[in-house]
């Protein structure tokens, strides 16, 4: 077997191509280029101290041996995490398919119709289960979904009602996350408290953490009378058999779709869900997929109501959510499509019947179970023997939950067998009864659900395979072309890095399994912590935040708690440059901080005079500065160390946004520069795929004095959790472990250098026609550059939207649009792209500029040309009545390098965004209904 260094496969340039690019950039070596781009004061000056790189095969073998130290006991712990069977047709054709996992968040609707359509079905699934009309296109997990729900309730009362009343027993990890969020928002969360006039919402669990259903009719009636919203945390499998919560008064329903065919993965990733009533639509957090039409009246999908979101409303946004859990939401939807409503109900009925037989057997021998009504989970009273019984269960290869000394909880699921139930019953001196009556509370579903045709269309694996292929063919992902999104780092997600995620030893471990049952995970996480600390210079890393935005929130919480520990409770003001990503101010607001914006100069740098003035003006209240480095303008600011020192001199801490860490690895370290805390987007710099809008992982690194203030977890007896599981989306950490293990210090540094070279090469080529808006001291950019396309608007009426849509005809996803400067494109090629693809992209943008000139010269009218009509579908270009002033060839094949056999055709023309928001349609109506 030929084993070349992995980095030679990861990095797209061949040695001879590198020299050609250096010639275009007008520099003699890549080291010289880096020395011109990167301030000398922040150079690391030594190699990273990491294990020597190994081959793909060696890394896979090493990780496999490590993860084999996890014990694959069968889990009956429950607590929001369940065994589930992932249909192989979904595992292979969706979860392990780069057409699905390498796509980006679907901001560009026309090239994202496949995953938008399936997310639309996800929203339909949630609406059907809950009975509520509007659902988000996934949230990060169940706990954060409830935290978002209480924020919705708080905002709905115009932030006047400050109390949240928990009227049932939540899972402990959910309660912990809610308490963390409530603390920063000034909300009072209490259990079984009186509902009063200043109660914003009550929270009900369906079922509760012990598995019991309770009669909430009176408390709901009281809440409605007092003007409080009703929030329900509901099990989506139980909902297939039970009346939809909206029918008995729910205003918001949240939960996790993990048990719909998504592995436990030691905590994630999983798709949380949230559905609301019509009155709460514009307060809902995260993404919503809406239906609209294209220019020909064809149905198309798009992200709707984006004015609620952080990238537009910043600190006024409904949430800081950017990346959610699109890939896992799509997996759950595919699971529902695969089984159909009847199949889902059969699974639920089998699980419930097995639980009833188990409980019946216990009751027959006088064993007491708490709660008259249940679905798949029961609390059993054992009077001081809880741990003894749990040990006996474990000896038989089964894990159960110890609630306290006197009670154990056993949760059955899709994978539970009669043999399992019988073995567990024997622990109590019981067996199973042959027959048992249902023990669900209230009446079951009295109406059909999931009657929409797409939940009934799949009858065989052939159908399912083609269904998923049909959807993925509509999309443009990294498996087809470069995605040059600035600040998003759409690099290669290598197959060897992804393979371990599907291993049973990675996928099938419960997050609350004991440390001795997850030794492999603990070792992998320990190693990854050490490697990331070396790469960044920090003292400790927390892997709990399950997105970059969650990392920001967790990091700011650490800073806030640090100040409070020193008695400086007044330090709640956060300085943020005007160029910052929208999640920065949104996260600061979520962390209970006041945002003050710092000006930027014309060259893109932070205005040091304005920063100094505001740091001194707010010296007594200053908590932190949030700063991205290199800046969102694609430049290494020379004064970054001075900026950090200035904040420290005025009592603040420096929050380092790690969105652009791909431009630092191996060259400089945030902690050495002066950062106190930094989040690392593992789904950018460290090779975890974007999944079409999630999963993401945003661990935070901190300096020594902030270590005590990292997120804790109730499972470990600590507080201030920000996610449901102790290590967040733990299963995909193996991707980053593999990436670092195979790249080694040399490979990581070379990747960073190559990313810088590629960006400067693009800047050099495009500067023939376009202005590169920002450059560093020596005329260089960092790993990305901002191309000023406003001249095309001024001279020819061609907008940045027109350019983005026209790039689709050339076979490209558009770069980041209008951020941080309206009317511009921010381009990041990463280190993974070959020169030929980079040249093809540059040729496309240069060709578009030439097309714009034809408008100026009168060859094409301003309102009838290939740019304003882009993108062009196959159907449109074959239209018998073609009457454009440009040819079909110019429409669909504007560049001779386009291969007709490999041409990407968008399924729709330009989507009407205004129409989609004016008449919001975010789920399919039941069969027989009309819009």
Swiss-Prot record:
Name the Enzyme Commission number(s) assigned to this protein: 1.4.4.2
Alphabetically list the UniProt keywords. Oxidoreductase, Pyridoxal phosphate
Function per UniProt: The glycine cleavage system catalyzes the degradation of glycine. The P protein binds the alpha-amino group of glycine through its pyridoxal phosphate cofactor; CO(2) is released and the remaining methylamine moiety is then transferred to the lipoamide cofactor of the H protein.
This entry carries the following GO cellular component terms, namely: cytosol; glycine cleavage complex
As its record notes, the protein acts as a catalyst of: N(6)-[(R)-lipoyl]-L-lysyl-[glycine-cleavage complex H protein] + glycine + H(+) = N(6)-[(R)-S(8)-aminomethyldihydrolipoyl]-L-lysyl-[glycine-cleavage complex H protein] + CO2
Please give the family membership noted in the entry: Belongs to the GcvP family.
Q: To which species is this protein native?
A: Bartonella henselae (strain ATCC 49882 / DSM 28221 / CCUG 30454 / Houston 1) (Rochalimaea henselae)
Per its record, how is this protein called by name? Glycine dehydrogenase (decarboxylating)
Q: What class of enzyme is it?
A: oxidoreductase
**A single GO molecular function, which one?**
glycine dehydrogenase (decarboxylating) activity
List modified residues, type N6-(pyridoxal phosphate)lysine: 684
Keyword Oxidoreductase set for record: yes
Entry-linked PANTHER family = GLYCINE DEHYDROGENASE (DECARBOXYLATING), MITOCHONDRIAL (PTHR11773:SF1), GLYCINE DEHYDROGENASE, DECARBOXYLATING (PTHR11773)
Provide the assembly information: The glycine cleavage system is composed of four proteins: P, T, L and H.
Instruction: Enumerate the NCBIfam families for this protein.
Output: gcvP, PRK00451.1, PRK04366.1
Q: Which GO terms describe its biological process?
A: glycine decarboxylation via glycine cleavage system
Cofactor(s) recorded for this entry are: pyridoxal 5'-phosphate
């Amino acid at each position: 077997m030929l084993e070349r260094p992995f980095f030679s496969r990861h990095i797209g340039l061949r040695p001879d191509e590198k020299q050609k690019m250096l010639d275009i950039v007008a520099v003699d070596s890549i080291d010289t280029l880096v020395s011109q781009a990167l301030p000398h004061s922040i150079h690391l000056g030594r190699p990273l101290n990491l294990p020597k790189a190994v081959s793909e095969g060696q890394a896979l073998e090493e990780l496999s041996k490590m993860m084999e130290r996890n014990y694959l006991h069968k889990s009956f712990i429950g607590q929001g995490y369940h065994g589930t069977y992932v249909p192989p047709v979904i595992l292979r054709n969706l979860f392990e398919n780069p057409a699905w996992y390498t796509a980006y968040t679907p901001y560009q609707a026309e090239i994202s119709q496949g995953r938008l359509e399936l997310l639309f079905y996800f929203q339909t699934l949630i609406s059907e289960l809950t009975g509520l009309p509007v659902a988000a296109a996934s949230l990060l997990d169940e706990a954060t979904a409830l935290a978002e729900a209480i924020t919705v309730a708080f905002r709905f009362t115009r932030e006047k009602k400050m109390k949240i009343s928990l009227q049932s027993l939540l899972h402990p990890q959910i309660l912990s996350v809610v308490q963390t969020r409530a603390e920063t928002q000034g909300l009072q969360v209490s259990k079984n408290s009186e509902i009063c006039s200043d109660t914003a919402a009550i929270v009900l669990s369906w079922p509760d953490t012990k598995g019991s259903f309770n009669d909430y009719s009176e408390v709901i009636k009281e809440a409605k009378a007092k003007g409080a919203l009703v929030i329900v945390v509901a099990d989506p499998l139980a909902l297939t058999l039970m009346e939809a919560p909206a029918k008995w008064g729910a205003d918001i329903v949240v939960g996790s779709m993990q048990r719909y065919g998504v592995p436990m993965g030691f905590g994630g990733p999983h798709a949380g869900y949230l559905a609301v009533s019509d009155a709460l639509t514009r307060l809902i957090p995260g993404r919503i997929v809406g239906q609209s039409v294209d220019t020909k009246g064809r149905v198309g999908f798009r992200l709707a109501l984006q004015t609620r979101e952080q990238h537009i409303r910043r600190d006024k946004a409904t949430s800081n959510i950017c990346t959610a859990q699109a890939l896992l939401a799509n997996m759950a939807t595919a699971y529902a499509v695969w089984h159909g409503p009847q199949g889902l109900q059969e699974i639920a009925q089998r699980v419930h019947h097995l639980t009833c037989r188990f409980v019946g057997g216990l009751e027959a021998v006088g064993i007491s179970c708490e709660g008259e009504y249940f679905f798949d989970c029961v609390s059993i009273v054992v009077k001081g023997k809880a741990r003894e019984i749990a040990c006996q269960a474990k000896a038989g290869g089964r894990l159960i939950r110890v609630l306290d000394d006197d009670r154990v909880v056993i949760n059955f699921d899709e994978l539970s067998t009669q043999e399992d139930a019988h073995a567990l019953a024997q622990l109590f001196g019981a067996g199973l009864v042959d027959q048992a009556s249902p023990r669900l509370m209230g009446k079951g579903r009295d109406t059909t659900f999931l009657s929409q045709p797409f939940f009934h269309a799949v009858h065989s694996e052939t159908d399912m395979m083609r269904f998923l292929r049909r959807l993925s063919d509509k999309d443009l992902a990294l498996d087809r072309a470069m995605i040059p999104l600035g600040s998003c780092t759409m690099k290669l997600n290598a197959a060897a890095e992804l393979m371990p995620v599907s291993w049973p030893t990675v996928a099938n471990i419960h997050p609350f399994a004991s440390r001795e049952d997850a030794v492999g995970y603990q070792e992998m996480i320990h190693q990854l912590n050490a490697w990331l600390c070396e790469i960044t210079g920090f003292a400790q890393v927390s892997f709990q935040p399950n997105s970059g935005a969650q990392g920001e929130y967790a990091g700011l919480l650490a800073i806030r708690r640090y100040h409070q520990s020193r008695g400086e409770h007044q330090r709640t003001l956060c300085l943020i440059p005007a160029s910052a990503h929208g999640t920065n101010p949104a996260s600061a607001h979520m962390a209970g901080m006041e945002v003050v914006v710092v000006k930027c100069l014309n060259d893109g740098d932070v205005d040091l005079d304005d920063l100094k003035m505001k740091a001194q003006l707010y010296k007594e209240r200053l908590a932190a500065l949030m700063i991205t480095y290199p800046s969102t303008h694609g430049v290494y600011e020379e004064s970054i160390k001075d900026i950090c020192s200035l904040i420290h001199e005025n009592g603040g801490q420096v929050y380092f946004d790690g969105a652009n860490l791909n431009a630092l690895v191996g060259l400089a370290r945030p902690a050495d520069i002066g950062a106190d805390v930094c989040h690392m987007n593992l789904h950018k710099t460290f090779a975890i795929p974007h999944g079409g809008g999630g999963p993401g992982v945003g661990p935070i690194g901190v300096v020594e004095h902030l270590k005590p203030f990292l997120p804790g977890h109730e499972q470990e007896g600590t507080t201030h959790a920000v996610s449901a599981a102790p290590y967040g989306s733990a299963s995909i950490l193996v991707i980053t472990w593999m990436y670092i293990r195979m790249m080694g210090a040399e490979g990581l540094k070379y990747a960073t250098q190559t990313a810088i070279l590629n960006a400067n090469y693009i800047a050099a080529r495009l500067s023939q026609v376009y202005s590169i808006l920002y450059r560093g001291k020596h005329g260089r950019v960092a790993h990305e550059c901002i191309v000023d396309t406003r001249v095309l608007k001024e001279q020819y009426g061609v907008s940045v939207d027109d350019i983005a849509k026209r790039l689709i005809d050339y076979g490209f996803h558009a770069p980041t649009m209008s951020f941080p400067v309206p009317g511009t494109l921010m381009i990041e090629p990463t280190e993974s792209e070959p020169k030929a693809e980079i040249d093809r992209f540059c040729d496309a943008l240069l060709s578009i500029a030439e097309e714009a000139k034809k408008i100026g010269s009168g060859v094409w009218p301003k309102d009838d040309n290939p740019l304003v009509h882009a993108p062009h579908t196959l159907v449109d270009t074959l239209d018998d009545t073609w009457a454009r002033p440009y040819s079909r060839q110019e429409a669909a094949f504007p560049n001779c390098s386009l291969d007709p056999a490999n041409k990407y055709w968008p399924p729709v023309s330009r989507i009407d965004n205004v129409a989609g928001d004016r008449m919001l349609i975010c789920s399919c109506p039941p069969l027989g209904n009309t819009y």
